């Protein structure tokens, strides 16, 4: 089992807080993530999380898909001194914001500010804020 029912419920509460639409959540290992990243983004390397929004052509469609690399999540959690489940939650928040149209590479800090608000709201470790400021 990748996450307990309680932790799945926690991710569901994050998703519901941000959007009434469904979200597909997929867990993969580093090899699978590298394959997805190469196929979808033409980058032949692994990464921690990817998001794939669906076009807003039909309101009944899910918001999109979030793909999380469990291998990197475990490594990063250990490196930063928090739990694997907390790392998954941080990555999920990051991906959800991308699904909602935020883009930290092209905005003026709006996505990072929203991440900070959500991390505080859900009482998660501030490591995502610290490491993204270093990027």
Curated annotation (Swiss-Prot):
Q: Name one GO molecular function term.
A: metalloendopeptidase activity
What's the main place this protein lives? cytoplasm
The protein's Enzyme Commission number = 3.1.-.-
Give the cofactor note text.
Binds 1 zinc ion.
Q: Does the keyword Coiled coil apply?
A: no
Which GO CC annotations does the UniProt entry carry? cytoplasm
Which GO biological process entries does UniProt record here? rRNA processing
Residues binding Zn(2+) are 94, 98, 104
Cofactor requirement: Zn(2+)
Q: Can you tell me which family this protein belongs to?
A: Belongs to the endoribonuclease YbeY family.
Its name, as the record gives it, is Endoribonuclease YbeY
Query: Which species expresses this protein natively?
Result: Campylobacter jejuni subsp. jejuni serotype O:2 (strain ATCC 700819 / NCTC 11168)
Underlying gene: ybeY
């Amino acid at each position: 089992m990748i996450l307990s029912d309680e932790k799945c419920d926690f991710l569901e509460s994050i998703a519901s807080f941000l959007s009434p639409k469904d979200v597909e959540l997929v867990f993969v290992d580093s090899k699978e993530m590298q394959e997805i990243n190469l196929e979808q983004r033409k980058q032949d390397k692994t990464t921690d999380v990817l998001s794939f929004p669906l076009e807003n052509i039909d309101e009944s469609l899910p918001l999109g898909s979030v793909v999380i690399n469990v291998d990197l999540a475990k490594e990063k959690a250990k490196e930063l001194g928090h739990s694997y489940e907390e790392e998954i939650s941080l990555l999920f928040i990051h991906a959800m914001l991308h699904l909602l149209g935020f883009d930290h590479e092209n905005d003026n800090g709006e996505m990072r500010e929203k991440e900070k608000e959500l991390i505080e709201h859900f009482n998660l470790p501030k490591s995502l804020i610290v490491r993204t400021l270093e990027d």
